[in-house]
Amino acid sequence: MASPGFAHDTAGMSTTRIGPRVTVGHGAILHGCIVEGDSIIGMGSILLDNCVIGEHCIIGAGALVPMGRVIPPRSMVLGSPGKVVRSISDTELEWIKYSWTIYKETSMSYGRSDG
């Protein structure tokens, strides 16, 4: 997960679970939601309690996904409240995978020194 986002849940009401290879943009808030793998959560987006983001999704910057909303796999979500605007293309799916790899490689380089 890329940072600095914020993940939190409401005890007894919701649980936050983030799947593998998810990229979370700066300032995003994940509050008691489930995000399946290989997805991108855009900068400043807000995911509220008990919403479920399917795998291979892109949640656009600033989107608000309301409580309990279920987003199908391979969906592009934009707006407030967030709405599915279209399906993710094969090219975008490759971009999702590439984005995660770049964040991972960048995070691994922190703390390294060439001497």
Labelled PLM ranges:
Residues 1-78, 82-84:
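Structural signal for interior beta-strand "rungs" in well-ordered beta-sheet cores
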